[in-house]
């Protein structure tokens, strides 16, 4: 048994029970220690998981399975350089093990070793040619490098992963040719940010002569009210009648997206009711003040949120900048970091008043700038044409590429990249310096 386990392997509870029983009988069982580590990793107890794998390696340093399991735990903990060493050791001990090689491939991509990841995918073509996850990893690397033509060839692989909610819909999938009056169903997928990202393509679909049925997340219905769709279909309702269909994230694929031909971001609709609500809450801006919105976490259910998110405390450095006033747009669990009434004197909590993306958009309209770690609010802000400073993890979402401080997808977005050391402190030092300069340029 090697972590991560295929779908037909035992549950975490079964692994934990087996490991405990084995260690009760023989504390010197090296692989039982590693199985304990696998279970601890699944429970999110990463320091203990890493220690358990090391205990196993102390007993048997030549077991490739334990090295690979250790590499996975280190990767989840963000200790990516150490993870690469562990995975390299696993593949050295057993070069022909496809799972060891795949785990190494994933770690290489997440550590930013893109060329190493592509080399591993080439090796896996011979070892495990039917592994669809390899194609998905290869797509992510190619897209990260800006090679959309090659990356999009494998982009459909995501639909065959166990994490994807449905691999296809009934009927004919649209291939991008003129619609000639046919009814096309644009099915939603993934998250809010992805929906905002590719909504820009709906106008191109409409221009190809179709009757467009757009599936939407309820939280986005108001801001996407102005899309040139003929029908709006809420996510979760039974599928409508249609002639052809396409997942929304495949719109850039079939419409031939390149870094030099991207349409402008979607034009969003902000209802008057939301504007009135936010104006009453935020009020008029006093002279000499720079109003800055902040967000420090995306949805905690997102698999890599621990890598892209930080904390409210990290943003407090920005409250030190003269003339800057912070407004929190943070929602859900992480917003509890702002429950302290003294902190609320320094950061105005807007999150509890934001019922949907329309309210958030109305709040952003009243701010001068949004500074945040990556989440759907970055897409929302940039689609509104407002300046957003997006603080991105070492290897971020593929639309942000692998270098530079800008992205062709959003002209008003400025990227502050985490370095290879994955140190947020250094990022916030640069952001604070930039904010000082921004205030000076505005004469504040």
Identify the role of each PLM range.
Residues 1-444:
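Alpha-helical solenoid repeat scaffolds of the TPR/TPR-like class and their adjacent stem/linker regions
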């Amino acid at each position: 048994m090697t972590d991560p386990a295929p779908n037909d392997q035992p549950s975490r509870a079964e692994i934990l029970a087996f490991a405990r029983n084995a260690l009760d009988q023989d504390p010197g069982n090296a692989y039982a220690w590693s199985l304990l580590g696998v279970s601890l990793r699944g429970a999110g107890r990463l320091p203990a998981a890493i220690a358990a794998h090391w205990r196993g390696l102390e007993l048997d340093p030549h077991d490739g399975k334990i090295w690979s399991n250790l590499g996975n735990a280190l990767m989840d903990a963000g200790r990516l350089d150490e993870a690469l060493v562990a995975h390299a050791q696993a593949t050295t001990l057993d070069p022909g093990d496809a799972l060891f090689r795949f785990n190494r491939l994933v770690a290489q991509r997440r550590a930013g070793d893109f060329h190493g990841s592509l080399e591993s995918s080439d090796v896996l073509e011979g070892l495990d040619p039917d592994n669809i996850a390899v194609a998905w990893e290869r797509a992510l690397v190619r897209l990260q490098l800006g090679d959309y033509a090659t990356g999009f060839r494998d982009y459909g692989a995501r639909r065959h992963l166990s994490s994807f909610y449905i691999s296809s819909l009934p009927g004919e999938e649209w291939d991008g040719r003129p619609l000639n009056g046919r009814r096309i169903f644009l099915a939603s997928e993934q998250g809010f940010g992805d929906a905002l990202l590719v909504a820009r393509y709906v106008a191109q679909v409409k221009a190809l002569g179709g009757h467009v049925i757009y599936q939407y997340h309820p939280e986005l219905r108001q801001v996407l009210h102005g899309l040139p769709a003929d029908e709006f279909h809420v996510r979760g309702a039974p599928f409508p009648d249609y002639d052809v269909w396409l997942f929304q994230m495949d719109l850039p694929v079939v419409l031939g997206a390149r870094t030099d031909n991207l349409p402008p971001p979607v034009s969003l609709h902000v209802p008057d009711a939301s504007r009135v609500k936010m104006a009453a809450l935020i009020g008029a801006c006093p002279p000499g003040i720079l109003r800055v919105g902040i967000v420090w976490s995306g949805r905690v259910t997102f698999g890599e949120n621990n890598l892209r998110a930080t904390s409210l405390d990290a943003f407090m450095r920005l409250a030190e900048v003269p003339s800057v006033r912070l407004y929190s747009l943070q929602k859900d669990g992480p917003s509890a970091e702002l429950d302290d009434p003294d902190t609320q004197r320094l950061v105005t909590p807007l999150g509890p008043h934001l019922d949907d993306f329309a309210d958030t958009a109305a709040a952003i309209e009243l701010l001068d700038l949004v500074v945040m770690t990556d989440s759907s609010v970055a897409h929302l802000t940039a689609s509104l044409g407002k300046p957003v400073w997006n603080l991105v993890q070492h290897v971020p979402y593929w639309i942000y590429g692998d270098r530079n401080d800008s992205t062709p997808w959003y002209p008003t977005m400025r990227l502050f990249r985490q370095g290879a050391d994955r140190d947020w402190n250094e990022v916030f030092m640069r952001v604070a310096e930039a904010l000082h300069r921004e205030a000076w340029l505005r004469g504040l």
